[in-house]
Amino acid sequence: MPDYLQQYFTLDNIIQIGISLAILLVFLILRKLFTRYFFNLLFNLTNRPKTEIFKQVVLAFDKPARWFFVALGLFLAIRYSPFLDEQMPVISKIYRSLIVALLCWGLCNLTATSSFIFHKVNQRFELDMDDILAPFLSKLLRFVIIALSVSVIAQEFNYDVNGFVAGLGLGGLAFALAAKDTISNFFGGIIIITEKPFTIGDWVETSTVTGSVEDITFRSTRFRTAQGALVTVPNSTLSMEAITNWTRMTKRQITFSIHVSYATPIENLERSIHSLRTMLLEHEGVDNEIIMVNFDTFADSYYNLFFNFYTKTTVWAENLNIREDINYKIIEILGAEGVQFAYPGQMVVVKQKHESDQFQVNLNKEEKERA
């Protein structure tokens, strides 16, 4: 073996390398045992309802804890290595930064939208979180956690965070001008969340878009249209528009007209209107608060019957089924009363020619007698 290698691979160094590899191997093996037994033990201790939140904390830090165990084994293995003594200060900083990153990972998991934490906070403080507020708060908390983690890691490597913040203060005006649209979209999102004109899954209509709300972010809101297209609208634009939320209807209106022939006897028409009102009052799908069935107009060639009522359901498919059932019953009632539907048409009166000529002759005689 060359002399320059012999100074590295001495008996003591080989023993230290063996110890380092053994430490790393033990920690790799214990990582599986740690995951299998340690977390099972924690789960068994947290089966009671009062410790449900602790169980969620364990779930959030499951994977970060596994990697921490591996990182700890790697750090100890490097520490016993005979070749990296001079690099240990830098390695220690990297190790501490890795711990901060793993802690950040676990906290981000803990603040996920589906986390039990949001449910408990919502119950404890009665915040009335909906499907929009929870994702928004989740993203906001994650941003704060990541920003703090980056700041701690930067300070670990002696980076002057205060100077960076001061630099942002000096360039704040330029940043505000450059990010004017982003800031307006952010505050537009806050307005939407606080006023709650809609929530995830609602069908809304604005001057810009009509569709189902899929998600709201710091910058924009995404909609799924009836054609299946995904439309993204900036929050600043959405917060300044009139928003119609069709999902929040308590009942759905049905209004239409029926044309009845002038040949229909008036008695039959009166009985038909009375029967139609009774039918709507007794229909289980119709709201009884407002029911209007009226003969309201004399048209050119028909009587006009006006209908206005509301269905109890706001679901579009159920509303169509109720409308179809009512239409069939209208046909039955009008048919039973002998009422005929009017068709678009025009009456043309034709006079015979000889009658017109006789009228003209008589008119000429009268004019001569007067003369």
Swiss-Prot record:
Q: What happens when the gene is disrupted?
A: Cells lacking this gene grow normally in minimal medium or in high-osmolarity environments, and exhibit the same survival capacity as the wild-type strain upon a drastic osmotic downshift. They sporulate and germinate normally.
What is the protein's membrane topology class? Answer: Multi-pass membrane protein
Q: Name one Pfam family in it.
A: MS_channel_3rd
Q: Which residues cross the membrane?
A: 9-29, 58-78, 98-118, 133-153, 159-179, 183-203, 330-350
InterPro entries according to UniProt: LSM_dom_sf, MS_channel_1st, MS_channel_C, MscS_beta-dom_sf, MscS_channel_2nd, MscS_channel_C_sf, MscS_channel_CS, MscS_channel_TM-2
Q: Which domain of life is it from?
A: Bacteria
Which compartment or compartments is the protein found in? Cell membrane
Keywords for the protein's UniProt record, in alphabetical order: Cell membrane, Membrane, Transmembrane, Transmembrane helix
Q: Does the keyword Metal-binding apply?
A: no
Where does the protein principally reside? membrane
Cellular component GO terms held in the UniProt record? plasma membrane
Task: Mention one GO biological process in which this protein takes part, according to its record.
Answer: transmembrane transport
Which PANTHER family does the entry link to? LOW CONDUCTANCE MECHANOSENSITIVE CHANNEL YNAI (PTHR43634:SF2), OW CONDUCTANCE MECHANOSENSITIVE CHANNEL (PTHR43634)
Q: What does this protein do?
A: May play a role in resistance to osmotic downshock.
- Name the family: Belongs to the MscS (TC 1.A.23) family.
Q: What is this protein called?
A: Uncharacterized MscS family protein YhdY
Task: Tell me the classification of the organism that encodes this protein.
Answer: Bacteria, Bacillati, Bacillota, Bacilli, Bacillales
The gene designation is: yhdY
